[in-house]
Amino acid sequence: MAEVKYQADSSKIVITGITEKPIKIPSQMYPLTGDLNYISHENTEDFPDNPTTEKIKEIYNSITPGVGTCYSNIEKLVDALEKEGIKVQPMVGWVFLGGSLPVHHCFAVIENHILDFNPNFDSLYTEENANLGIDVLRDKLTDAMIELRKKPNSETTAFGKASKMALYIASPCKPQAGLKVYQKLMKAFPKHPCYRNIFEGTNETQRMFFKKQGMI
């Protein structure tokens, strides 16, 4: 497997070693809606211990996030936070997890704190798991997803500090505008490399997750 390399400046990032051709963000195939922002474990922080954080946590934990519905998840969160007078910025762009293909994604930030309902799988990124076959790893991943969803969002997702394995490349954007960007992208590139395993709007991991819970 080729080494994943990132070459970045203030206006673009080029990633090699994931796909045959370099991934360039922003570009026609990997668009952004505005200025490029890099968000990672290194430049995010845990929320401070104060009453405002407790209110943010209460609202964050009150949302039941759907799987594969990041745009509507963040729209609900932003609406709830803004009703309480809390300033929050929705973001739309691309997230890389552990050097894998990027996924178009919607999340939110409050200053240098991230809010992302994606489960935090840092504990699964081990040398042992790296050597597992994709089907075995997917089975292990979905079991972990089911267990994590039994706990408060703030304990199992990126609440404040980003995952060590995640790199976000995104721009400020309202969730529904981000969804339109995604839909336009899929129409222009129906065989987009990041969605080559998508079927009826879900990927194989998400389908296994739904099947284990009797939802399909």
Regions found by a protein language model. Give the residues of each.
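A structural boundary/capping signal
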Residues: A2-I216
